[in-house]
């Protein structure tokens, strides 16, 4: 049960971090330096 719980928590943290990273990279107001590279 402990291994299953660790696997579930790891998957949740992985998807949450992907979601937050996607929001930060797609939001120009959060990341104004991105306009300089384009």
UniProtKB/Swiss-Prot annotation:
Query: Under the cellular component aspect of Gene Ontology, which terms does the record hold?
Result: chloroplast thylakoid membrane; photosystem II reaction center
Subunit info here reads: PSII is composed of 1 copy each of membrane proteins PsbA, PsbB, PsbC, PsbD, PsbE, PsbF, PsbH, PsbI, PsbJ, PsbK, PsbL, PsbM, PsbT, PsbX, PsbY, PsbZ, Psb30/Ycf12, at least 3 peripheral proteins of the oxygen-evolving complex and a large number of cofactors. It forms dimeric complexes.
Tell me its family.
Belongs to the PsbI family.
Is this entry keyworded Nucleotide-binding?
no
What is the annotated localization of this protein?
Plastid, Chloroplast thylakoid membrane
Which key words are in the record? Chloroplast, Membrane, Photosynthesis, Photosystem II, Plastid, Reaction center, Thylakoid, Transmembrane, Transmembrane helix
Enumerate the transmembrane spans: 6-26
Q: Does the keyword Secreted apply?
A: no
Question: Which organism is this entry from?
Answer: Phaeodactylum tricornutum (strain CCAP 1055/1)
The record describes its membrane topology as: Single-pass membrane protein
Q: Name one GO biological process term.
A: photosynthesis
Role played: One of the components of the core complex of photosystem II (PSII), required for its stability and/or assembly. PSII is a light-driven water:plastoquinone oxidoreductase that uses light energy to abstract electrons from H(2)O, generating O(2) and a proton gradient subsequently used for ATP formation. It consists of a core antenna complex that captures photons, and an electron transfer chain that converts photonic excitation into a charge separation.
InterPro entries for the chain: PSII_PsbI, PSII_PsbI_sf
Q: What is this protein called?
A: Photosystem II reaction center protein I
An example Pfam family from this entry, by short name, is: PsbI
Q: What gene name is given for the protein in this entry?
A: psbI
């Amino acid at each position: 049960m402990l291994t299953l719980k660790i696997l579930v928590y790891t998957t949740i943290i992985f998807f949450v971090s992907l979601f937050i990273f996607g929001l930060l990279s797609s939001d120009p107001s959060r990341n104004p330096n991105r306009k300089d590279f384009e």
